Amino acid sequence: KAVSGSGVGELSSSSLKRWSAENSVTMSSKVSGMNTLLSVSARTNNPEPGFQLINQRITHSTINDNIWASLQNAQIQALKTLDQRPAEKFAQQMYETRYADDRTKLLQENQIAQFTAADALAADRQLFSSPADITFVIVGNVSEDKLVALITRYLGSIKHSDSPLAAGTPLTRATDNASVTVKEQNEPVAQFSQWKR
């Protein structure tokens, strides 16, 4: 099935897994800094399903309400028990001190409760920034002409869609110093975090 019309975007989760297996295509994603990294593997002689999957990921993703309810509950419980995790609490304080920006503050319980599955999906799509900014790193023996045609077909229209993916505004730095200090402890020289989604 192609993406447009009766495409990958309309498949259920189980059907999508079966479709992926039949087409030998897999995808994983993670957030790194301000970027969302998508890793897609497909057959060298048939890369098209890989682009169909990227298109589906950006334009047709949904979040099941029941799953979102359990994620919400987990976040609320984590918020309530933050005092029991001093390392996380310290990292959060360091984050808030580093940036003079309200977005660094932890969400309150009532804010998490008001967040819907649709809101979560919209936030997820924000991570992609502008589709014009998508950078491809191709590993494999595939002709450039073939790739350009696929990129144009499956991703070229996304930036002109009805729901553009707006880029988020970068956080405002509170200080130009190399490090900030919280409770007489210095910030680590480098801190790198990864989230698997």
Regions found by a protein language model. Give the residues of each.
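His-Asp-centered metal-binding catalytic motifs of divalent-metal-dependent phosphohydrolases/nucleases
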Residues: 1
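M16 family metallopeptidases and their MPP-like homologs
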Residues: 4, 11-59, 72-80, 85-112, ...
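Acidic/histidine-enriched alpha-helical segments
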Residues: 14-22, 61-80, 143, 162-176
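Conserved short hydrophobic interaction patches
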Residues: 19, 23, 57-60, 150-161
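Solvent-exposed, non-transmembrane alpha-helical starts
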Residues: 48-50, 67, 149
